[in-house]
From Swiss-Prot:
UniProt xrefs under Gene3D superfamilies: DnaJ domain
Protein name: Protein translocation protein SEC63
Stored Pfam families: DnaJ
Quaternary structure note: Component of the heterotetrameric Sec62/63complex composed of SEC62, SEC63, SEC66 and SEC72. The Sec62/63 complex associates with the Sec61 complex to form the Sec complex. SEC63 interacts in its phosphorylated form with SEC62. May physically associate with KAR2 in the endoplasmic reticulum and this interaction may be regulated by ATP hydrolysis. Part of a complex consisting of KAR2, SEC63, SEC66 and SEC72.
Effect of T652A: Abolishes interaction with SEC62; defect in protein translocation
Species the sequence originates in: Saccharomyces cerevisiae (strain ATCC 204508 / S288c) (Baker's yeast)
The encoding gene: SEC63
First-listed, main subcellular location of the protein, grouped into a coarse class: endoplasmic reticulum
General function of this protein: Acts as a component of the Sec62/63 complex which is involved in SRP-independent post-translational translocation across the endoplasmic reticulum (ER) and functions together with the Sec61 complex and KAR2 in a channel-forming translocon complex. A cycle of assembly and disassembly of Sec62/63 complex from SEC61 may govern the activity of the translocon. SEC63 may affect SEC1-polypeptide interactions by increasing the affinity of targeting pathways for SEC61 and/or by modifying SEC61 to allow more efficient polypeptide interaction.
Length: 663
């Protein structure tokens, strides 16, 4: 081992090393960014054609109109997707741009480095030296060698060459000779194949891929400081930060202290206690995340801010704090929902979902919440004039003018916008509900079934479509191999749920549906909640405006009504446990609730009929050996029968004689 190391004075190594490390970072980031630019929007929206465009535009424009300037300012600050400028000058884009600039500089430096070119020319390639291909025959090799020897042999060089030119020609001839021997002489060829050179092992040098001034010069202490900072400070800092975050937060993204508070509340929860929105908000006010955001505020302050938001009250100087904690409630309530399902507590789970609806729409949980979530509604006027109207379905039994009177909306333009929002809030109608087992016609003991729901997403303005009008083929599950292998794949092909109308929520909200399954026997939740984020809202488009429940019509004769134009959505819920081991009927409660709207949710009872598998008929397989044995058996049986026939005849005759004797 040499005691002295050579430094990379000619910059032969370190540019390539840095270039490789840089490309390992910049390359994948660039590909990911290109994918998001060209395919990210389509993957996020998920819809196509009118089934997407109308719903997105309706709520986009109305959200923009009814969102306050304070919330818009908050969104520009915290919502990265709300600012186009932030998309262009995002941190990732800046890193990519700077990275490719550095790549270009390094490539230019490498290409203009003569030392790298000289190192490349030192590589011995006999085929290149002789000017032949790697598939050349021995005859071609000898022919090329003769031609080059005539040109570069020292005895045949021109007399007018300078000493330098003559030296180059002689060196070239030596290389030609070595190349020829590397391909024809067996010993020299072995050296070339083993060491890469016909002369055998070449001298090697050990160096440091850094310039001398960084190690031996005045910059040496700086390099040591950089190494110490990288290995002793920066790397441990990021690793410890990652580890602390991993240990401090649950899989649902909530702090362990918050999760511990939720668990403690559920442990101490009394079944006789009524679950209300106020109770859930009280639990939320102790979230550790809120304390991290605003250390100077207390849980009572957080609870007051949440109450201000739900009742649409101004919080003065604490408005920004209110927006911040309200925006965080999304992950907190999903974490509470998951913990409640772990405790199998259906009341708390439903309370968490209803509370989130209240927070999204900024409406308290009352019998009138379906109406109060609409824009432009005069709350005091409506409560005094409401009568028995509490739902959107009941509201759309009135004429538009009467609806304006009930809601206290006098301006026709505002009334039209209110009706537009009301008619595009999704309602679910169950068409078909089954327990299915892939590849089976029925649920068998200990099998793995799942719940398949066929639903019609409709508007409260539209009349109910009789199930008898829906063709059976529109409800039938596909039976191909891929569907049997992964029955949930078809759900991923449905479009994403559009953005919700939520002008009071601090961030843009894309709606979803939460599915809960509980036992009808004891009311306990059986598994974790299933969140549905893909479901077609095509039936809410403008082309269905003619379909108004206030207009009497015969659907079978209406010229614009075509059942095939109506989208049937599919919701599949995997069960977290196998079917019971015994045969019988088992009843389950299935709940599908919107997380963003007060609307018509699904709450149905399903019967799981567990039956034994039908008996399989055994098919006898023909065998020549069995046939031989059966022939012998037949002969034996015939012999036995012939022997037994004598006794039979005697018995018969005797009986005949006995019968005749009395006569």
């Amino acid at each position: 081992m040499p005691t002295n190391y050579e430094y990379d004075e000619a910059s032969e190594t370190w540019p390539s090393f840095i270039l490789t490390g840089l490309l390992m970072v910049v390359g994948p980031m660039t590909l990911l960014q290109i994918y998001q630019i060209f395919f990210g929007a389509n993957a996020e929206d998920g819809n196509s054609g009118k089934s997407k465009e109308f719903n997105e535009e309706v709520f986009k424009n109305l959200n923009e109109e009814y969102t306050s300037d304070e919330i818009k300012q908050f969104r520009r600050k915290f919502d990265k997707n709300s600012n186009k400028k932030s998309k262009i000058w995002s941190r990732r884009n800046i890193i990519i741009i700077v990275g490719w600039i550095l790549v270009a500089i390094l490539l230019q430096r490498i290409n203009s480095n003569d030392a790298i070119k000289d190192a490349a020319t030192k590589l011995f390639d006999p085929y290149e030296i002789l000017g032949i291909s790697t598939s050349a025959s021995d005859r071609d090799i000898k022919s090329a060698y003769r031609k080059l020897s005539v040109k570069f042999h020292p005895d045949k060089l021109a007399k007018g060459l300078t000493p330098d030119e003559k030296s180059v020609m002689e060196e070239t001839y030596v290389q030609i000779t070595k190349a020829y021997e590397s391909l024809t002489d067996e010993l020299v060829r072995q050296n070339y194949l083993k060491y890469g050179h016909p002369d055998g092992p070449q001298s090697t040098s050990h160096g440091i891929a850094l310039p001398r001034f960084l190690v031996d010069g005045s910059a040496s202490p700086l390099l040591v400081v950089c190494y110490v900072a990288l290995l002793g400070l920066i790397l441990p800092y990021f690793v410890s930060r990652w580890w602390a975050r991993t240990q401090s937060y649950t899989k649902k993204g909530i702090h362990n202290v918050t999760a511990s508070n939720f668990v403690s509340n559920l442990v101490n929860y009394k079944p006789s206690e009524i679950v209300t929105t106020d109770l859930i908000l009280h639990w939320l006010s102790f979230a550790h995340e809120f304390k991290q955001f605003f250390p100077d505020l207390q849980p009572t302050d957080f609870e007051k801010l949440l109450q201000d938001h739900i009742n649409r009250r101004d919080s003065g100087k604490l408005n920004n704090a209110k927006f911040r904690i309200v925006a965080k409630c999304h992950s907190l309530l999903h974490g509470l929902l998951d913990i409640a399902c772990g405790f199998r507590n259906l009341d708390i789970a439903l309370g968490a979902i209803n509370t989130f609806k209240c927070i999204v729409q900024a409406v308290p949980l009352t019998p009138n919440c379906q109406i109060l979530q609409l824009p432009n509604v005069d709350k005091e006027h409506f409560i005094t004039k409401t009568g028995d109207i509490h739902t959107l379905g009941k509201l759309f039994t009135l004429e538009d003018a009467k609806i304006g009177e009930v809601l206290g909306i006098k301006d026709q333009a505002k009334l039209n916008e209110t009706l537009r929002v009301a008619s595009h809030i999704p309602n679910l109608k169950i068409i078909k509900a089954d327990f299915l087992v892939p590849g089976e016609n029925q649920v068998t003991p200990s099998s793995t079934p799942y719940i398949s729901l066929k639903v019609l997403v409709r508007s409260a303005k539209q009349p109910l479509i009789p199930t008898s009008l829906i063709p059976e083929e529109n409800l039938t599950e596909p039976q191909d191999f891929e569907s049997q292998r992964d029955p949930f794949a078809m759900m991923s092909k449905q479009p994403l749920v559009p953005y919700s109308f939520a002008p009071f929520f601090p961030t843009k909200r894309r709606g979803s549906w939460c599915c809960l399954v509980s036992s009808q026997k004891d009311g306990k939740i059986l598994q974790t909640p299933i969140i549905i984020e893909k479901l077609s809202y095509k039936n809410l488009n403008d082309d269905k405006d003619f379909f108004d429940k206030r207009i009497k019509m015969d659907l079978t004769k209406h010229e614009k009504f075509d059942i095939n134009d109506w989208e049937i959505g599919t919701i599949k819920i995997p069960l977290g446990q196998p079917a019971p081991e015994t045969v019988g009927d088992f009843f389950f409660r299935v709940i599908v609730k919107s997380t963003d709207y007060f609307t018509t949710d699904l709450d149905i009872t399903m019967n799981m009929k567990v039956r034994d598998s039908p008996a399989v008929e055994q098919v006898e397989v023909y065998s020549e050996e069995d046939d031989e044995y059966s022939t012998d058996d037949d002969e034996t049986e015939s012999d036995d029968e012939s022997d037994a026939s004598d006794y039979t005849d005697i018995d018969t005759d005797t009986e005949a004689e006995d019968d005749e004797s009395p006569e």
